[in-house]
């Protein structure tokens, strides 16, 4: 990563790294190098969950645990993180292996979402919890202003099921079609079948549940519900 690119991505993120190797690692997919971003992603996922949970706790003093959990799930889910990645144009900074490059990995939501988490982890290691918390809250400022408790915070699988039931349609079927990677770091691919849609809706995620949620979200969009 040359100096110009490094300077550009740091400006986009709103943070200047002391240890540039952490930035480089955060942007490196496992297909490109043995020194990839998955451990940083693990760390960043936990930090993000804490920061968002704390923000919701402070902003909504009278909301119960269930609503806060649903709001947090909405804010930290894969497609929300991918939206942030698109806003930062992260795809153009990723270091991918040839296979992922050819298959359009720089546009894949799961890779982009994981990279945002890895960046959070790397910024924490490069600075401290206060700095990374302030940065996350800046990234999420508009989303935190807009979010509110209610049915819209139900997860995609629940919303899809309730929609289909309201139309007296069959419930969706989910099938695992591929599990890639080692046991501690797998990528699941799920097919979701809806009776009124001819093709399968494809979801991916780091767990079966996340992949099913991704597929359900795509089904809701396909059905014109969202």
From Swiss-Prot:
Protein name as catalogued: Ribonuclease 3
Entry annotated with the keyword DNA damage: no
Main EC class the enzyme belongs to: hydrolase
One record GO biological process: mRNA processing
Localization of this protein: Cytoplasm
Cofactor requirement: Mg(2+)
Family: Belongs to the ribonuclease III family.
GO MF terms, alphabetically ordered: double-stranded RNA binding; metal ion binding; ribonuclease III activity; rRNA binding
UniProt catalytic activity: Endonucleolytic cleavage to 5'-phosphomonoester
Pfam families: dsrm, Ribonucleas_3_3
Catalytic site: 45, 117
One GO CC term, this protein: cytoplasm
Keyword Electron transport attributed: no
Biological role: Digests double-stranded RNA. Involved in the processing of primary rRNA transcript to yield the immediate precursors to the large and small rRNAs (23S and 16S). Processes some mRNAs, and tRNAs when they are encoded in the rRNA operon. Processes pre-crRNA and tracrRNA of type II CRISPR loci if present in the organism.
NCBIfam families: RNaseIII (TIGR02191)
Domain RNase III, chain residue ranges per copy: 6-128
DRBM domain: residues covered: 155-225
Ligand binding (Mg(2+)): 41, 114, 117
EC number(s) on file: 3.1.26.3
Listed PROSITE patterns: DS_RBD (PS50137), RNASE_3_1 (PS00517), RNASE_3_2 (PS50142)
Assembly and oligomerization: Homodimer.
Main localisation: cytoplasm
């Amino acid at each position: 990563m040359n100096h110009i690119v490094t300077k550009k991505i740091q400006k986009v993120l709103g943070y200047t790294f002391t240890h540039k190797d952490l930035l480089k690692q955060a942007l490196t997919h496992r297909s490109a190098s043995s020194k990839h971003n998955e451990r940083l992603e693990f760390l960043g996922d936990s930090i993000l969950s804490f920061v968002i949970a704390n923000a919701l706790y402070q902003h909504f003093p009278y909301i119960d645990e269930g609503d806060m959990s649903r709001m947090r799930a909405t804010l930290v889910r894969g497609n929300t993180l991918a939206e942030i990645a698109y806003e930062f144009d992260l795809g153009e900074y990723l270091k991918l292996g040839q296979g992922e490059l050819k298959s359009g990995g720089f546009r894949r939501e799961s890779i982009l979402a994981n990279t945002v988490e890895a960046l959070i982890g790397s910024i924490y290691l490069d600075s401290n919890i206060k700095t990374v918390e302030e940065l996350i809250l800046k990234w999420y400022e508009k989303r935190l202003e807009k979010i509110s408790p209610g049915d819209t915070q139900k997860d995609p699988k629940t919303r899809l099921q309730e929609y289909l039931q309201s139309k007296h349609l069959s419930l969706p079927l989910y099938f695992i079609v591929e599990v890639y990677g080692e046991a501690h770091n797998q990528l699941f691919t799920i097919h979701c079948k809806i009776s009124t849609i001819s093709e399968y809706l494809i979801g991916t995620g780091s767990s079966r549940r996340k992949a099913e949620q991704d597929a359900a979200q795509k089904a809701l969009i396909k059905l014109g519900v969202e």
